[in-house]
Amino acid sequence: MKRLIVILLGCLHLAAVHAQEFGGQLISEWQWDMNQHTNWLNQVRLDLNLPLWHGRGAIEAATLHLANIRHEALIDDWQGFSNIEAGNMLAAIAVLGYSHHWASARVFVGVRNVNEDFFTSPVTALFANSSCGIVPTIAASYPIANYPFSGLTFYFDVTRGRFTFRNSLCNGVG
């Protein structure tokens, strides 16, 4: 038993040596429809960044874990009123791919959610009335990788002074 524990800890140590950044975020909300129904929603996001090539490149990974106590939504509306309500889901891939950085540009190739770069801020999940996570006409009219789904993506951005130009080529919902 000791040998097994030592081997497992050694493997974890080797994996942790290369992990430059590992983080998590928990967002929880309680819903009430002002009648008899309530719901408790939780979203856990785990992020991992493994630097390569002396910090110029990186393997990026992020997963979303969603849980709520009700199987159906509180209101009969396809948009809902929560930025994190998406049904129960274990380990949905939000980001998985390779990014490379230059002085003023960045390229990413892999699986990515469109909300990662364009339609959200670090505090978006804390507000109600999500409009499906992004601009509602985009979410309703085009098959894009909207929250909580991701799709194959080629993304790049270029920064000049105060301006940043961003562009993505996505294959739709993954």
What is each residue range found by the language model?
Residues 4-13:
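Sec-dependent N-terminal signal peptides
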Residues 15, 173-174:
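Short, intrinsically disordered, charge-balanced linker/junction segments flanking boundaries
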Residues 31-35, 80-84, 139-142:
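Extracellular loop and loop/strand-boundary signature of outer-membrane beta-barrel proteins
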Residues 34-37, 71-73:
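Short, glycine/acidic-enriched capping/hinge loops at junctions between secondary-structure elements
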Residues 18-33, 57-61, 130:
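Transmembrane beta-strand segments of Gram-negative outer membrane beta-barrel proteins
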Residues 50-137, 147-172:
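Outer membrane beta-barrel
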Residues 38-52:
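Short catalytic helix/loop segments, enriched in acidic residues and glycine
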